[in-house]
Amino acid sequence: MDNMGKDKNILKIRANLIKYIDVDEIEELPKVKVKNVEEFLEAHRVLGKHVICRYKDNLEDIFFFVDNGVIFYIPSDGFKTLEDLIEAKSLGLSAEEYYEYLEFGDINEYKKYKSSGFKSIEEYKKAKDLGFIGGLEELVKEGIAQRLDDKYIIEYLYYGILENREFSNDAELYYFAIEKGFSDFDELKNALKAGFGDANEYKDALNRGFKDAYEYNDALSKGFRDADEYKIAKAIGVNSKKELEEYMELKRICENFGLETFEEGYLLKVLMDLKIDEEITLKELYNKLKEKERLMKIKKDVLNKLANLSSPSWYSTRFTTVDDLEEYLVDSEIVSYLGEYIKEEKIFRRIYPPKPSRRIVIIDAISVLNNMHNLSPNSIENLIKKIKNAGFKNIITVMDTVTYYKIKGKDICRFLANECNIKVSKSKDEAYKLIIEYIKNFGALVISNASFKDYIIKDSKLFYKDIKEYIIPFIVENGEINLDIELLRKLYTEVVTKRIEKIKSNVVS
């Protein structure tokens, strides 16, 4: 320990032994201002004094003692004791600073506080607890902030606009974080690393599954709701929510009806959208398909040019000539469910329901096979026979993956595969959506029960009264699946009658 340290400790020991008396008034006596605290304590010792008085009014604030009618004093400068004054002097602190320093107990920590720019010790301590002290330097190390002279520069996106923010100290960073809604430094750091400068945006992006602000803002500007949609769109080269919805719609049509190209899906969509008995010529239909192809190619070329990329369009095509399209209209089974192509007139006419021979019956396997232990081994075979005997030849079994794995590898599954078309959807909802599509577009009848009815009622977009006439209820009795065969026959007869009446009216006209 050097001499200065020894002297300070000796002075502190002396000061610590002193007793203090606070006085309210001082008599008019001669006063001597002692040069410094060291001389003051030495005089106090030499003169054999044991107490020091403290006095404060509007004019002065002093430590003093009296000897032979003379007041010896030094200014207290706001200190409570001489020991405090001595310690503060050694640290180079004023009284206000010294008592602030005592709240830290560490001079280095106090110096950090003084240079940090915080408005109060309480806010500094709160910021420290939240990790903001030393935050700017950590952001520099992480490559998030850049240091330029005595400033720190941070870039981030705010609602899609690139902003630059300058910070002089950790306090400014802390107040910025509080203003922007961040809970602690780690959250702010992670957000800034991802390009976000606002907590609400950052949290919204996380909830939607986005990895950074650029992806998030690009997605929102194009109408995408979440990262999954956005990733699908990027993977297939789609640049907007509207185009993705079109892609998903055509993809669903292709998957549901076993089509190889999106152009076939678009063809089916055009035919489905025709009004009942509406006609479209072969040439008009071909022109629609080629106009769609042209628009998709233009859109893709523009996107490739903007992005300096070259990626193929997701819109796959099939028809290169009018003859290709005509051959497809004649031969396609799925097209025949929607109406009829009259080759001599080169016209397609939308018919609903289709010809009786084309009327589809769907077995809702989710409902029918729900309690398989109640069914006899031949129950499904007998059900198929009943349907065919009623005049319906086109039978489709629709199920979800749960139902499929119940019957996979069993005789019932092999029988259904041989006797009808099986369509497996990922979920119960997807399966019922497919059934609804068959009803709306093909006039399909559905063998089902309350499960399907409940689905329709829960969906605000569907109206049960419009669909209930297509539902054929069933019950299980003695292991057999029983349904109203007369109702099936009645529906079949009504279709035949309507078909004949339509033909007659066309002939008369």
Swiss-Prot record:
The RNase NYN domain, residue ranges: 358-480
Protein name: Uncharacterized protein MJ1085
Organism: Methanocaldococcus jannaschii (strain ATCC 43067 / DSM 2661 / JAL-1 / JCM 10045 / NBRC 100440)
